[in-house]
């Protein structure tokens, strides 16, 4: 066996060894043991060893020709005991398994103390394994900040169960605290912030400057359209479209698209974007334009006028979100069942229903003796309970 040097140690080739990197030193140890009874080292004192090894995360390579290397056996054992789906976690964030310092047990105890079940905790870690890298202090501080918005621990647990990323994505608690203070300062209510936290948590991970930029832009946009209360305008827009705080360029482009396409004056545009058309502001401008062009082309082919097309879209702005093929297929489905385009124009929400729902309901109504050409087709988009109650009444008179 060759002698050891401070820069590098050379040993006879073998399959099983650990490689530990440290400043100015490289040791090779056999048999996957670190400082264990069967490992060997050069004759350095423990004091010298630990002086040369910095206490940061380091990688451990376990070479084995028979199986995939395991990065941290204690971590794997802990996660398996907790019921974590290891395969899912590895696929989502493999880097976590390279860490030698993790806090899965602390995370488990913390979430249990907040009312989370073991199953929920396992699900959270399976889907967002980076959660186990957060320290107890960081978790506690972040939880306290969330409680300034969310009224109970159980509500937070429910949010984490649906979207673990919302809580664990960032560990910058100062940025979170500053964003909460700012959003409260511009007049957003606790209820509004709770909806943002639940549905658009990245708002709170944005830089404070980005959020300020968007809110200031919205206030200016509201004033330019004649709204006399900028704070109220911001509240209305954010409540209608919770993913809005992302791009001022996108919002500007979509405001101009709505204004020019539908020939709206400032008052009409204000009513639209504070109401049913608010979500269009957050849509890709290219997508919005392509979607409208397809709607226009399809309805023109069925004999509709420009005025009818605009009336249709303005009364049901959500139609812009439908993919081109899906919109065309739904129109064709209804037309094939002798429902006229004028009926669809007058009752655009029938397009909320899936094609399978439309077909099954149309069949049931025909069997009940209904004349679809004279029927108010809005019931095609009703809730299941309401629709079935109406169908039952219609069947009695058949």
From Swiss-Prot:
Phosphoprotein with mostly four phosphate groups. While the DNA-binding activity is unaffected by the phosphorylation state, only the phosphorylated form of the protein is active for termination activity. Functioning seems to be regulated by phosphorylation. Gene3D superfamilies: Transcription termination factor 3, mitochondrial (1.25.70.10). Pfam families: mTERF. Residues 169-170, 246-250, 323-330, 354-357, 383-390 are annotated as: Interaction with DNA. The record marks 162, 202, 287, 349 as: Interaction with DNA. One of its GO terms (biological process) is DNA geometric change. Keywords: DNA-binding, Mitochondrion, Phosphoprotein, Repeat, Transcription, Transcription regulation, Transcription termination, Transit peptide. Residues 1-57 form a transit peptide. One of its GO terms (cellular component) is mitochondrial matrix. Its main location: mitochondrion. InterPro entries: MTERF, MTERF_sf. It is found in: Mitochondrion. Disulfide bonds: none annotated. Belongs to the mTERF family. Transcription termination factor. Binds to a 28 bp region within the tRNA(Leu(uur)) gene at a position immediately adjacent to and downstream of the 16S rRNA gene; this region comprises a tridecamer sequence critical for directing accurate termination. Binds DNA along the major grove and promotes DNA bending and partial unwinding. Promotes base flipping. Transcription termination activity appears to be polarized with highest specificity for transcripts initiated on the light strand. Contains nine structural repeats of about 35 residues, where each repeat contains three helices. The repeats form a left-handed superhelical assembly with a solenoid structure that wraps itself around DNA. This is Transcription termination factor 1, mitochondrial. The gene is MTERF1.
């Amino acid at each position: 066996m060759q002698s050891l040097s401070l820069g590098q140690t050379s040993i006879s080739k073998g399959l099983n060894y650990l490689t530990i990197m440290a400043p100015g030193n490289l040791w090779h140890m056999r048999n996957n043991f670190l400082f264990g009874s069967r490992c060997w080292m050069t004759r350095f004192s423990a004091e010298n060893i630990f002086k040369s090894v910095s206490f940061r995360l380091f990688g451990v390579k376990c070479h084995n020709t028979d199986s995939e290397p395991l990065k941290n056996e204690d971590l794997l054992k802990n996660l398996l005991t907790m019921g974590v789906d290891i395969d899912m976690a590895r696929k989502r964030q493999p880097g976590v398994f390279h860490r030698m310092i993790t806090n899965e047990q602390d995370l488990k105890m913390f979430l249990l103390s907040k009312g989370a079940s073991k199953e929920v905790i396992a699900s959270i870690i399976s889907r967002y394994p980076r959660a186990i890298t957060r320290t107890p202090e960081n978790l506690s501080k972040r939880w306290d900040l969330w409680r300034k918005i969310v009224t109970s621990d159980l509500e937070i647990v429910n949010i984490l169960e649906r979207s673990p990323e919302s809580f664990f994505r960032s560990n910058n608690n100062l940025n979170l605290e500053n964003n909460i203070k700012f959003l409260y300062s511009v007049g957003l209510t606790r209820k509004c912030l709770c909806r943002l936290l639940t549905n658009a948590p990245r708002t709170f991970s944005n830089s404070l400057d980005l959020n300020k930029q968007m809110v200031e832009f919205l206030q200016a946009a509201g004033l330019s359209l004649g709204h006399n209360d900028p704070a109220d305008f911001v509240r209305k827009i954010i409540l209608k479209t919770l993913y809005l705080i992302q791009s001022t360029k996108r919002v500007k482009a979509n405001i101009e698209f709505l204004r020019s396409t539908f020939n709206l004056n400032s008052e009409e545009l204000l009513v639209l974007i504070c109401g049913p058309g608010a979500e269009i502001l957050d849509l890709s401008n290219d997508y919005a334009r392509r979607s409208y062009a397809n709607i226009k082309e399809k309805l023109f082919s069925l004999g509709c006028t420009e005025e009818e097309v605009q009336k249709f879209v303005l009364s049901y702005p959500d139609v812009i979100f439908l993919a081109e093929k899906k919109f065309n297929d739904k129109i064709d489905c209804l037309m094939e069942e002798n429902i006229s385009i004028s009926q669809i124009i007058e009752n655009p929400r029938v397009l909320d229903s899936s094609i399978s729902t439309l077909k099954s309901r149309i069949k049931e109504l025909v069997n009940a003796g209904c004349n679809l050409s004279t029927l108010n087709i809005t019931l095609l988009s009703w809730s299941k309970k309401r629709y079935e109650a109406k169908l039952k009444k219609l069947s009695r008179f058949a």
